[in-house]
Structure formats: structure tokens, C-alpha cells
A protein has these predicted regions:
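Extended, charged alpha-beta segments that form solvent-exposed binding/catalytic grooves
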Residues: 1-189
Length: 189
């Protein structure tokens, strides 16, 4: 009986005080994203398992999925991230939207990860997607949105350090130093 009276490991209850804090957090995220011209979208929490197999063939995320076969005999998974969902949505209706597309979502995600302090198996995340503009200005806009979000929570330049880098440039540099294995390169970075 005690087991059914507790939330599952890695999941949590939101009592009114925690709910109020969560609503403040998500309300701030929405306000800032909208101030940058982003429009909110959402997708299903449950997706076909193949959507994640295609994106992460052999990747770590596949081992962290909450997946099962539903009553219709379909292999499905609770979404662990938003990128495959938004990609699927945009492919389905690509001609209906002018680029650049500036969308954001605030959604729950699920990963069956090893439990650690501060890492839950269900978590809420802000995603800001700027599609159809690969310019440095688009990258700068996303960084500005990030900074403004942190400022909205009271952080200042005394609290924030952003280091901009280019993984390809680092990989090229490491190759000149004799580091060609990707796993070694990631450790070096």
C-alpha cells in the first residue's frame, strides 16, 4: 500500500506552492519568447518509436526511452525531446509557413535515466526553434533570448557567462594536434 501512496522514482507531485513556482517559471518563459516574436506550438506527448530510432540510430537516448507497445500493436514512446516532433510537424506542413519560422514550446519530457540529484525522469523544458535562417544573426537572436530569459529571473552580467564556440573548428584544431577519434575529442573539449 505504501508504494501506491508515493510518486514513482524520478517523478514528483506539484502541490499548490510548487505549482505556483512552476507557473511563474513558464509564464516568464512565454513572455520572453513572445517578446522576441516566437509563437507557441506543442505536439503529442506520445510519438511513434521509429521517430526516435531514426534520429538517434544507436544513440544513448534510445536506452532512456519510456517505450511500449500500445493496444493497437504500435511501438510508441513518451517524448524524450522536442526536436523530432517539431521536425515531423514542419515536414508535414512546410509549405504553409514562411521562413524563418520562430516557434517555442514548453512541454514535459520523459527519460529513463539513472537518478541523480536535480535530474528527474519527467521534466519541463523550454525549446526555442528558429528554422530557415542559418545566419549568425539568428544565432545571436537565440543567445539574446537566452540572456533576456535569465535577466527576467533576476540574473545579471555578474551571474552570466556565455562562451560561444564552433564544434567544427574545435574538431579541426584537435585533428591538427593528433586527436582524430570523436570520443577522445569530446573528452578533450
Amino acid at each position: 500500500m505504501a508504494g501506491i501512496m508515493q510518486s514513482l522514482p524520478g517523478f514528483r507531485d506539484f502541490f499548490p506552492a510548487e505549482c505556483a513556482r512552476r507557473n511563474y517559471l513558464t509564464g516568464t518563459w512565454r513572455r520572453v519568447a513572445r517578446s522576441f516574436g516566437f509563437r507557441e506550438y506543442d505536439g503529442p506527448t506520445l510519438e511513434p518509436l521509429d521517430l526516435y530510432r531514426k534520429k538517434n540510430s544507436g544513440g544513448e537516448i534510445l536506452g532512456q526511452l519510456f517505450s511500449f507497445t500500445d493496444k493497437g500493436e504500435r511501438e510508441v514512446a513518451l517524448r524524450p525531446e522536442m526536436t523530432p516532433t517539431v521536425a515531423r510537424m514542419l515536414i508535414a506542413k512546410a509549405r504553409e509557413y514562411r521562413k524563418p519560422i520562430k516557434w517555442f514550446s514548453i512541454a514535459p519530457f520523459f527519460r529513463y535515466e539513472k537518478q541523480q540529484s536535480g535530474r528527474l525522469r519527467e521534466f519541463l523544458q523550454l525549446n526555442c526553434d528558429l528554422v530557415g535562417d542559418a545566419s549568425p544573426a539568428a544565432d545571436a537572436e537565440l543567445l539574446a533570448l537566452l540572456i533576456e530569459t535569465l535577466r527576467a529571473f533576476g540574473l545579471t552580467s555578474d551571474h552570466i557567462v556565455i562562451r560561444v564556440s564552433d564544434r567544427r573548428a574545435w574538431m579541426e584544431f584537435l585533428a591538427t594536434q593528433g586527436v582524430t577519434d570523436e570520443a577522445q575529442a569530446c573528452e578533450a573539449l
